[in-house]
Amino acid sequence: MAKTTPSSPSAAAAAELVVKSVNTIRFLAIDAVENVKSGHPGMPMGCAPMGHVLFDEFMKFNPKNPYWFNRDRFVLSAGHGAMLLYGLLHLAGYDSVKVEDLKGLRQWGSKTPAHPENFETPGVEVTTGPLGQGVGSAVGLALAEKHLGARYNKPDFEMVDHYTYMILGDGCQMEGISNEASSLAAHWGLGKLIALYDDNHITIDGDTDLAFTEDVGKRFEALGWHVLTVANGNDGYDEIREAIKVAKSVTDKPTLIKVATTIGFGSPNKANTYGVHGNALGPKEAEATRQNLGWPYETFHVPDDVKKHWSRHISEGAELESAWNAKFAEYEKKYPKEAAELKSIITGELPLGWEKALPTYTPESPGNPTRTLSHQNLNAVAAVLPGLIGGSADLTASNMAFLKSSGDFQKETPTGRNLKFGAREHGMGAICNGVALHSPGLVPFSATYFVFTDYMRAAIRIAALSKARVVYIMTHDSIGLGEDGPTHQPVEHLASFRAMPNILVLRPADGNETAGAYKVAVENAGRPSILSLSRQKLPQLPGTSVEGVGRGGYVISDNSKDGEKPEVILMGTGSELEIAARAGEELRKEGKKVRVVSLVSWELFGEQSKEYKEMVLPSEVTARVSVEAGSTFGWERFVGLKGRAVGIDRFGASASAERLYKEFGITVEAVVAAAKELC
């Protein structure tokens, strides 16, 4: 928009067009919600001014290529206000949000789901909805920009240069995850992160005075943010513009802009009430709002002058991307190595033969905890994947989740690939989601004790829903951790994550399986992976393989003769595969025909052909025993009604690992006894 003096005719016309554009956004939200009688009109009505100013006057993007690498990122953390984002994408010319899509809000098969979903709607950067998740994701996006810029920008070429903007609400501010992530954003000095806080003082239960009376601005100042205030977010367009300009000038810390808004602005009877949060206005109030705001148009109408004004973003966006592409071509000539790495991060293309970097193991290789084997494989992968970056929630040494060849990512050392999250599991999870969704070739890893996934489950679920490739390095995965006791010993966790859609749970037993788990995690770009790893030392087992892990389940030993079926099948995962293997040897000494199967990943095994699954677990063999130091829930799928599942269906206890395995009956003897009952 051209700069003009407020008194000139062009200034008056421009100001009038802004108001009309903002009201277009408001009524697209009102009409979409009224059309399906479901949704949240209040937030888009109140936030339309800041949304308009941000998208129309500040953000750089290409509507015809929503995935242009150097675009500014926008996160609607208050995801229930999705119609604000859909309306902005529609006006800006994104093909993903046509008027038909607006009419299909929250309906089956639409590109406009109730809350923004990155995999459904091009132009949506991250999936939001559970309050506060978007704050963490936005921090991850800003972290990725700072890190990649530090690694690949040159004095004469600034190839990574974008801002991350977000709009968050009172609910986001109340959630603990937002404070965890915001604390790290300030610590890391993410100066290109700008948060606009929809400060409307209304929650679902009523006024924020009911439960939220803290001074948010002072809290963020204490965290280390730059804090600005817009007193009039309803029509104070110059205030909003000036605040964003000032925020962009502050480069050493993130900025929070407190924008005082009125939820449901323009509604004569429902504005500034919780009744407009999650309910349609109703026909009478919608019409009254039209009268109040002087909106004479039919539903879903975009006035021609508004349409023309916004249409420039198509050509401007194409020009921005074209200029960047030309600049990258020059960069590639001068800095071929850096350009090749950056291109792999932008495209997500894996180096040819990258998996050859993974270590190999034999039964004669020394035994190790799988957390140690994970460390070996993590560092091998880091050497060939420049986009691998991550860290632990204050358990780096215990999780063994660090890159030896790299330093720490800090405010003054942003090239480091090791992230120190502190004891902030939930924030860590959401931040890694943002990193993963910034660029296809970024592969974030996050680590903690397996039991503490309870602190970050919501973020892991969002990763699975978002198809985000995050690698979760979860150590101390059973009673095998020993004396720390039941608060730290996971029991139900494997079962609970196996129940979660679109996530891989991998529980490797030794070096070959750990290498296979890393191969699977890296190659599955459309879903996250949990690596469930032991604290205790485990032997390298005969018969395990990287290839077997890729199938999720496979035979590691079988003494049946060709053409014969085994009398009994023993199944195990992780640290208990050794127990199954030893039990098999004991039974074979007694003349039994025994097959031992590693079920390292139920999800991958379930995706194999019916023929392959029948080959590994022939249906006519009903004598089956599983062994796993966790809940037996779900094992009936594999052992059947006639089989036995050896496991733990109570909380653990404080004792040595050896004593715990004995007391809970997770032993070779218990597996042998169960097998003998069946065959």
Curated annotation (Swiss-Prot):
Leaves. Thiamine diphosphate binds at residues 80, 129-131, 171, 200, 277, 425, 452. The keyword Transferase applies. Mg(2+) binds at residues 170, 200, 202. Keywords: Calcium, Magnesium, Metal-binding, Thiamine pyrophosphate, Transferase. GO terms for cellular component: cytosol. PANTHER family: TRANSKETOLASE, TRANSKETOLASE 1-RELATED. Belongs to the transketolase family. This is Transketolase 10. It comes from Craterostigma plantagineum.
